[in-house]
Every structure is written in structure tokens, then in C-alpha cells.
């Protein structure tokens, strides 16, 4: 389709479970993208993991042809985006390739914090945002209240927002008509030299790197020589095409279109996301503005259970980083766990997903250590360093000041659950910044230590508000705090993988909890196992896993007390000897115990 005015590029913004993948299914069905027998729920969520958890993790793209009521056939390039707070990076990438976005809001639930955050990202990038109310068939749907909320909270006019039900298909054609009318056509020139933005790329064992691109100017076809701007390497194009939703090869990709390019790039860093592609004959085409690199918020050590898997693990991480560029990793070694990698994630869900993808897609067995955030330390020498691993913390005597990262959290919550949410924030050492009453909802803004947020704040928030509160947060600053390193000693030996950095006020409590938890998880040995929590040289908590022992007095019956004493002393000496040479195996659950501290 050569006419730019007949192309519409858009993505869907919505909170988790507001029905964007279902709406995508309806679009595909109405535009005849798949035969009836191939239709299945959530066609675009291709990863098994996405289907099981019912969430979208990766952004997916589809090209559909829609014949509008005015008789014109439009090409719709549609990019499905994730809704979870950990995957905002995927969303900002998808938005960079579009001219417009559909803001899908559940007509029963109303506006949630995550859609607000993504909507602002879209408006900042200059996109046309079109509100759509979904799930209008539900008995609890209140379209008027929700339209009012969209105007109050986000500030876009929603008086004549389209209403539909993606599940039943009601009003979906109306959404498509409105979309074609409101979302602007792309601007670009087919005659100009090629300029294309890489939105996403992944590694295929047969084809090499497959890149999803948005062509801004010019055209690209099979047999062209393309130049990757950041690496300066030239590759020959094997094929170009679009997803509708299957791989479909086309003659070429032109300005304004979204599609894939395969150029048998074998190096996994050969086509980085956010990079610009052009033809090798026009190397001086300006670079397109990419997306801002996102800094990981949470760090954890990942170690293969068997050290023979280390090389496979490294390769798996490299392939995964291509597909998920927000993942960062550096090699690390631990006395307790051997060789592995210190990985940076965007949040806890992201960490779980990555671990599951590594275990499933690459068949690895992994152990994860407790996640931590980055701390800023000012040393007595005046030097500032950043520490993402408690076991790498320098000696306390050399530290002038320890600072922890603070996040600015926006929480949207119905008024009846406000009290519980405030109690939770205070318990997590939060400081209230602002509170706004918007209709039935309240928007509270808190400054919270990131250390408290990353572990279980999201789950606790959902449970105290019966699932109604929603959260969006971003890093704000570093702030001085009274922090200490809590070490765990097992039989007097420090286990580096179990160390934590905690606030001094909580340290005794955390130490007690941790030792109690470890006592349940470490199996009983033939000798007593002492589990201690220490801050520096001071032991703050201790529990003992009692030894298994044989009853050596069973054969004595009424015998003499000195005989009994002799047998008991002999047993004691044996246990003492065992303790000196014995090693304690720590099970994987024990490393994760740190996560489950309330």
C-alpha cells in the first residue's frame, strides 16, 4: 500500500487485565488476519509463560487490512504492549513507533495508576490518545463515572469515548472506525534515503537476528545492503515482511510501515534495539532518537546449580538480552555457590519471568540469591561508590555515609481502602508527599525506600486493598539512612550469598526472622548446627538445629550411672569430631527464605 494517508500505526495502553489482548484478538478476527480455526484466545501472547500467567510480557506487532465504511482499505499496524509496572520499557519502545494510542479502560474498575503512567509517556512522545471503555457488557460497568475519572485523573477529554466489549465483540467496529478517523497518518517520504528504527529484535537459531522495524523514510527490499548505524557493519537483506499475525514475506517495506527484516546477522549484538538502519549507499542519514536506556532497579545473583552449565548459562543470557534489552548482567563468583552472574532487573516480576524463561527456554537449573537495590556510599576518602551486592560492601570503618535509593510512588486507591494503604506505607518507612481526592478515588504520593518496595510491596498493597489499589513508581534520589549489613553465619562461617543490607531499626527483628526461617529449612545433621545473624562482630540472633542422635543408653537397663556417663561422653566426643569436619548443605529454599520475610 503506497499511499501514506491510508496507514495507521497505533498501540494499546491499558492496565493489567483491562482486556487489551482480547481487543487485539477481535481486531485480528474482524480484519480476517487468521482463519476461524486458527483463532485462539490471546493470539499475540506467544510465549507459554504469557499464556499461563495471563499477562503480556513482550510487545508484539501485527499488520491488518481494514475496509472502512468509506470504502477505503486502511493498513493498520498495531503493537500490543504489556501493562505491568515492570515492563514500562517495552511500552516506551512500542510507542516510539506509533502516531497514536488507544487507552483501554475497564468500565467497571476505572482508571489505574499504570495506565496513567503509560498515558503520560504517550502524550510526552506527541501521540494522539484515544480513550476506549471496555467490558461494557458487565453488570458493574459505570461508563459515565469512568469517563469522568479519565478527564479528572489523566486530563484528556473523554465525553464521547467509544464503548465496547472486546469479549462479545460489541462495538469493536465502532472502535476501528473512530481509530481510522482520529489517529493521524504517518509522515514520511518514500523517495528519501532509507531511515528505519529498530523497535525489537530476537534471535532465531536458523535465521539469525530478526528485527522488528518502523520505516520512517525510504524503502527496503530483499537484496538491499543495509548499514546498522551504531556498529557500522553492512548486512545483506534476506527477506522483509509483516506479521498478520503469522510471518508473511512482502516485496518491500515502505515509509510509514512496521515489519520485520532478516539479514542473517549472526552476532547477537549486531542489531541493538533503538538503533537506526539505512542503506549502505547513504551512510550519512541522521540517527533517529532511540529510547532512553532504563537502569535496572533490582539486582540478584543467578547461579547454575551444576557448575558445568556455566557456559550454556552465559550463552542463554546473551540471547535473552537481545530480546529483552532491559536485562543487564556481569560475572560474579560466590564462595557458597560458585560461578554465576549478577543480573539487574526492572522489578521482582521481571526477575521471576527472566528466571523462568532461562529455565524453560534454555533448560537450565538456577539458584537465585536475595534481590537487593543499589546503595550509594561515600567513603572517608571522599570517593563515591555504588554497591549492588551486600557481600561487596567495604569495611564499615572506611564508610562516611550510606545512602539508599528513594522512589516516588503514586498510588491510586478507592477511599474505603485508604487507611490500610497509609498504614502499609508507614510500616515501609514511607513519607507522604501529597494526597488528592478525585471522585471516588484518592491519589496518594509517597516517598518510599526502594529496598522496601522491590521485595513484596506490590503484593502487600494488592492484598490490603482487596486488589483495588494500583501503583506506579520511579526512582527519585539517594538519601542518607542508618543502614547496616546483616550477615548470616552457619556454624561460625559467613555465607556470602545470604547477606542483606537493612535499616538498623529493623535489623534485630529481621535477624531473628531470618534465623528462625533458616532453622525450618536446613535439614537436621548428625551434629548441632548453629545459625546466627550478625552485624559486624555483634551477634543479634541465634537458633540451633538440634542434632539427630542415637539413644546409646538403650542397652543399659538398670545399669550403673558411671557406665551411662561413659557412653554419653563417648557420643559427645564423636559429635564434636564430626562438627569439626562436617559440612552443612544449604537447600535452595533457604536462599529464597530471605524473600519471604514479612
Swiss-Prot record:
Family matches, as InterPro entries: EF-4, EFG_III/V, EFG_V-like, EFTu-like_2, LepA_C_sf, LepA_CTD, LepA_IV, P-loop_NTPase
Residues the record lists as binding GTP: 17-22, 134-137
Enzyme Commission code(s) on record: 3.6.5.n1
Catalytic activity: GTP + H2O = GDP + phosphate + H(+)
One GO CC term on file: plasma membrane
UniProt domain tr-type G: residue ranges: 5-187
Bilayer disposition of the protein: Peripheral membrane protein
One Pfam family named in its UniProt record: GTP_EFTU
SUPFAM superfamilies: EF-G C-terminal domain-like, P-loop containing nucleoside triphosphate hydrolases
One GO biological process term: positive regulation of translation
Cell location: Cell inner membrane
Superkingdom of the organism of origin: Bacteria
Residues forming coiled coils: none
CDD domains referenced in this protein's UniProt entry, alphabetically: EF4_II (cd03699), EF4_III (cd16260), LepA (cd01890), lepA_C (cd03709)
Keyword terms of this UniProt record: Cell inner membrane, Cell membrane, GTP-binding, Hydrolase, Membrane, Nucleotide-binding, Protein biosynthesis
Gene3D superfamilies: 3.30.70.240, Elongation factor 4, C-terminal domain, Elongation Factor G (Translational Gtpase), domain 3, P-loop containing nucleotide triphosphate hydrolases, Translation factors
Family per record: Belongs to the TRAFAC class translation factor GTPase superfamily. Classic translation factor GTPase family. LepA subfamily.
Function noted in UniProt: Required for accurate and efficient protein synthesis under certain stress conditions. May act as a fidelity factor of the translation reaction, by catalyzing a one-codon backward translocation of tRNAs on improperly translocated ribosomes. Back-translocation proceeds from a post-translocation (POST) complex to a pre-translocation (PRE) complex, thus giving elongation factor G a second chance to translocate the tRNAs correctly. Binds to ribosomes in a GTP-dependent manner.
Protein name: Elongation factor 4
